[in-house]
Regions:
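Juxtamembrane/transmembrane-helix interface segments of polytopic membrane transporters
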Residues: 110, 114, 118, 148, ...
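Hydrophobic alpha-helical transmembrane segments of polytopic membrane proteins
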Residues: 132-155, 173-176, 226-233
Length: 244
């Protein structure tokens, strides 16, 4: 892998994002607005907001980064940009790492802003260390980014890329334990939840929120990081020059 080529790709993506203020607004404003909405939905029940607010700090950035990166990568193919880049002496891994660097940086800023607003302005309380919550929120956003880059290879249009949200992300939201504890689900659904990335992302944030810093938390984080690397590797293997 060439560090210079990957960094050049990242700088190009940064330049594109800078010229697209609407995307920046979507990335930075929407997750924060959703957390604020939750705060005022449970204004008379602060305990509920504290219980679900910490896990959602990681889930909202996961969703937005998944959506933005999958659409952006598809647009690069359909406009011919990806084909021109791959005609150059640039390895697939260099290209994907460059995109990963750019979107990981955006994900870090996004998750940090959401966390600062939640803890500073919305008075979200957590029993665990706030710094660790921010780190996990960033990790989950990067996971969403890597999965978005990978799954974009299977879409031919932006509409199809958007459809991955209800097809791939929404079932994970239902089964990760956010709505119903997994041990209270039907056995087949509980087993299925162990194969979903968002289960481990949610569990990690939930444990930090409850100040359960133990080996299970380390396992959850390790699974999230492993899946992130795996998704990027699969993305490099399935990367196509253009959409057929």
């Amino acid at each position: 892998m060439s560090v210079g080529s990957a960094w050049a790709t990242a700088l190009r993506v940064f330049a594109q994002l800078r010229r697209d203020p609407r995307t920046i607004a979507l990335l930075m404003v929407v997750p924060t607005a959703l957390v604020a909405l939750l705060k005022y939905m449970f204004i008379d029940s602060p305990g509920i907001f504290d219980r679900i607010g910490v896990p959602l700090l990681g889930l909202f950035p996961f969703i937005t980064m998944f959506l933005i990166t999958s659409i952006t990568m598809l647009r690069e193919r359909t406009t011919g940009t990806l084909e021109r880049l791959m005609a150059m002496p640039l390895a697939k891994l260099d290209l994907l790492v460059g995109y990963g660097i750019a979107f990981a940086a955006v994900a870090a800023v996004q998750a940090t802003i959401v966390s600062l607003v939640a803890f500073g302005l919305l008075d979200l309380h957590t029993s665990g260390p706030r710094g660790l919550v921010v780190v996990l929120a960033v990790t989950n956003a990067v996971l969403g980014m890597s999965l978005g880059l990978f799954l974009s290879a299977f879409a031919r249009t932006e509409f199809q890329a958007v459809q991955f949200l209800p097809a791939f992300v929404f079932p994970q939201l239902l089964l990760c334990g956010l709505i119903v504890p997994r041990d209270q689900m039907a056995r087949v659904l509980e087993i299925a939840s162990y194969f979903l990335p968002l289960t481990y992302a949610y569990d990690a944030l939930l444990r930090v929120g409850e100040d359960s810093i133990d080996a299970r938390l380390a396992l959850d984080v390790a699974v999230v990081l492993t899946l992130t690397v795996l998704a990027l590797s699969l993305g490099a293997a399935t990367l196509r020059r253009q959409t057929p």
